[in-house]
């Protein structure tokens, strides 16, 4: 193949050298496995967890959507005292489960929102990670947690009882959503 060369203008050489030195230093930190400390104001969750303003912003786009009949049952679950129960929303993909959850988040009072969280599960997450994040949320006083796409957890079926046996019995309201209705065994 042909050889192509690009020349850096003289007035940009020093800036480019500084950038290359920074990149080299950062690469060395990565190779050494250098872990940076998380600033104290940042909550260190292992998975995707939304709380506070992020949670409200996440829910905002569905504010004008019409509520479905099932919304009343979800709202009733959220309004009653927790009693060792977990609410499960299951159905086909793209049928509105997450939209329903977002609508419920929008309707939370300021006090409820301050103690609510949304967890987005990915295929790379494990039940152990979700468990650790739920424990962190419980320690910080969160009482209502929505866990979306929970059936993406490869070990979900084996450990599903964790949600009701550990967290719901301690007063946490859990709303789980997922696509594989056969995965819900409790």
Located regions from the model:
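Short, exposed beta-strand "edge-strand" segments with a Pro/Gly-rich flavor and a Y/T-containing core
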Residues: 1-7, 61-66
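A positively charged, amphipathic N-terminal helix/segment that binds anionic biomolecules
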Residues: 2-33
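Phosphate-binding site recognition
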Residues: 28-186
């Amino acid at each position: 193949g042909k050889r192509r060369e690009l020349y850096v203008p003289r007035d940009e050489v020093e800036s480019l050298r500084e950038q290359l030195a920074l990149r080299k230093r950062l690469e060395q930190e990565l190779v050494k496995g250098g872990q940076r400390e998380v600033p104290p104001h940042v909550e260190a969750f292992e998975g995707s967890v939304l709380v506070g303003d992020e949670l409200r912003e996440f829910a905002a786009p569905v504010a004008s959507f019409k509520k479905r009949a099932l919304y009343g049952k979800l709202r009733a679950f959220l309004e009653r005292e927790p009693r060792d129960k977990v609410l499960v929303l299951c159905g086909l993909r793209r049928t509105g489960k997450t939209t329903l959850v977002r609508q419920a988040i929008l309707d939370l009072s300021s006090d409820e929102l301050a103690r609510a969280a949304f967890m987005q599960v990915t295929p790379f997450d494990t039940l152990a990670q979700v468990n650790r994040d739920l424990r962190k949320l419980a320690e910080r006083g969160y009482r209502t947690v929505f866990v979306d796409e929970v059936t993406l957890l490869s070990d979900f079926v084996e450990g599903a009882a964790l949600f009701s046996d550990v967290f719901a019995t301690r007063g946490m309201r859990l709303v789980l959503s997922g696509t594989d209705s056969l995965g819900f065994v409790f």
